Amino acid sequence: MGRLVLLWGAAVFLLGGWMALGQGGAAEGVQIQIIYFNLETVQVTWNASKYSRTNLTFHYRFNGDEAYDQCTNYLLQEGHTSGCLLDAEQRDDILYFSIRNGTHPVFTASRWMVYYLKPSSPKHVRFSWHQDAVTVTCSDLSYGDLLYEVQYRSPFDTEWQSKQENTCNVTIEGLDAEKCYSFWVRVKAMEDVYGPDTYPSDWSEVTCWQRGEIRDACAETPTPPKPKLSKFILISSLAILLMVSLLLLSLWKLWRVKKFLIPSVPDPKSIFPGLFEIHQGNFQEWITDTQNVAHLHKMAGAEQESGPEEPLVVQLAKTEAESPRMLDPQTEEKEASGGSLQLPHQPLQGGDVVTIGGFTFVMNDRSYVAL
């Protein structure tokens, strides 16, 4: 049957297109829909906007050599004809039809009826549970080349899951017996046999099952929990933060060590003004030019001089000219015995040591000697 349908389908498509184009002017503004219900009844409906308030008539035949018959079972919409129902049980025929306004053809065409097949909804659907799987069965239809599709979902699923077989014996595995599942079944015609214009059957009634027992309904889908920061993400973030901190600390330590081992070299331009700007780095010319105008640069933070330089005046004179001295008895005895006066020795402190004429002096930065 499948091969025959495909072979005849191509011929009828070309023939139907030629016949429709032959009446192209009359077909303007008319849209049709054909549904072949379970290979039993053909329904042809039309939407003629140009003839919305007109009772159009439908004429048909199943053989190109026969005369047209007029429809006897019209569909009405707002009191006007909008379609026709034809009895065509188990027929693989071409439907020739013409929609007319009185005797004037409005739309004329021919179509292979099985191209618009719509199977009936599955009947006698049964469920057989075994552990974590369920087998769905129903009564097979009298014709073949069909797909039986079972869809199911639990309140925790966001979309329907689907499985289909060539016969109405579909086993679904991997189910959780503690969950409640909703099921429904439908039948579809194979596209490679009947073409792309067929219609799937209506869905069967929804059936709910839990723990192998039928339920009136499944609970509503629970609200998904708010996303929480997982331990892995938290630990990873802390590890990255620690690594970055250690890296920054290492760079700071490296900078400190580099600064300690390799001190910064001062810029000679600030120490020798004019050496490079005026003398082009010639130190001999620079020292000649600046030897009489050298400035004393004090170090920053150096102690300010507290006063003028203190002169240290040394005068060599006779000891007899000195003023009378008061001597104690022990001193007089030592002098009388011819010994010289010995002063206690104390360490010299303060600065540079200068010896002049047997006298020793300690000089600081604010002293000078005048002879």
Curated annotation (Swiss-Prot):
Disulfide-bond pairs as recorded: C71-C84, C180-C218
Query: Where does the Fibronectin type-III domain lie?
Result: 118-211
- What stretch of residues is annotated with the motif WSXWS motif? 200-204
Would you tell me the Gene Ontology cellular component terms?
external side of plasma membrane; extracellular region; plasma membrane; receptor complex
Q: Which residues lie on this side of the membrane: Extracellular?
A: 23-231
PROSITE patterns, alphabetized: FN3
Q: List the ranges annotated as motif Box 1 motif.
A: 261-269
Name a biological process GO annotation: positive regulation of mast cell activation
Return any one Pfam family short name: CRLF2-like_D2
Cite the entry's keywords alphabetically. Answer: Cell membrane, Disulfide bond, Glycoprotein, Membrane, Receptor, Secreted, Signal, Transmembrane, Transmembrane helix
CDD domains linked to this entry: FN3
Glycosites: N47, N55, N101, N169
Position of the signal peptide? 1-22
By sequence similarity, the record places it as follows: Belongs to the type I cytokine receptor family. Type 5 subfamily.
**Remaining remarks:** The gene coding for this protein is located in the pseudoautosomal region 1 (PAR1) of X and Y chromosomes.
- What is this protein's function? Receptor for thymic stromal lymphopoietin (TSLP). Forms a functional complex with TSLP and IL7R which is capable of stimulating cell proliferation through activation of STAT3 and STAT5. Also activates JAK2. Implicated in the development of the hematopoietic system.
Tell me the protein's name: Cytokine receptor-like factor 2
* Species in which this protein is naturally found: Homo sapiens (Human)
Taxonomic path: Eukaryota, Metazoa, Chordata, Craniata, Vertebrata
Gene name of the record? CRLF2
